[in-house]
Amino acid sequence: QECKCHGLSGSCEVKTCWWSQPDFRVIGDYLKDKYDSASEMVVEQHRESRGWVETLRPKYTFFKPPTERDLIYYESSPNFCEPNPETGSFGTRDRVCNVSSHGIDGCDLLCCGRGHNTRTEKRKEKCHCIFHWCCSR
């Protein structure tokens, strides 16, 4: 909720409030946190009076069971390291990676443990520098 005050000289004689969406970054960070802590489930079939019923149970019982607010999954993601025409993935071979990053663009993650080649480039470029005389005597 956001609010704004109205009045003379910034006084808050009238206050108007409205609901607003959180910052997009906050929402993204929240969803990423949920994704990273998602619980893997197993589909079990059992017979009841009305026929076969499928239920989900946590794959790993030593973790606490997921709540209604947690994300769950029962199929693993495909291997994005190798090309897969079915999913349209080209794999990660020959991609440019960032040696100093530990994020998704880092070589350890992006190269899927295959190792990476490092190339050093030297470039001569015009810097478009301009000399500004700063001071008078």
UniProtKB/Swiss-Prot annotation:
GO CC annotations on file: extracellular space
InterPro entries, sorted: Wnt, Wnt_C, Wnt_CS
GO BP terms: canonical Wnt signaling pathway; cell fate commitment; neuron differentiation
Record GO terms (molecular function): cytokine activity; frizzled binding
Cellular compartments annotated: Secreted, Extracellular space, Extracellular matrix; Secreted
Lipid addition sites, O-palmitoleoyl serine: S9
Disulfide bonds: C3-C17, C5-C12, C97-C112, C134-C135
Modifications made to the protein after synthesis: Palmitoleoylation is required for efficient binding to frizzled receptors. Depalmitoleoylation leads to Wnt signaling pathway inhibition.
Main localization (coarse): secreted
A Pfam entry, by short name: wnt
Domain of life the protein comes from: Eukaryota
Glycosylation: residue positions: N98
UniProt keyword annotations, A-Z: Developmental protein, Disulfide bond, Extracellular matrix, Glycoprotein, Lipoprotein, Secreted, Wnt signaling pathway
PANTHER family: PROTEIN WNT-3A (PTHR12027:SF88), WNT RELATED (PTHR12027)
Protein family per UniProt: Belongs to the Wnt family.
Function description: Ligand for members of the frizzled family of seven transmembrane receptors. Functions in the canonical Wnt signaling pathway that results in activation of transcription factors of the TCF/LEF family. Required for normal embryonic development.
Descriptive protein name: Protein Wnt-3
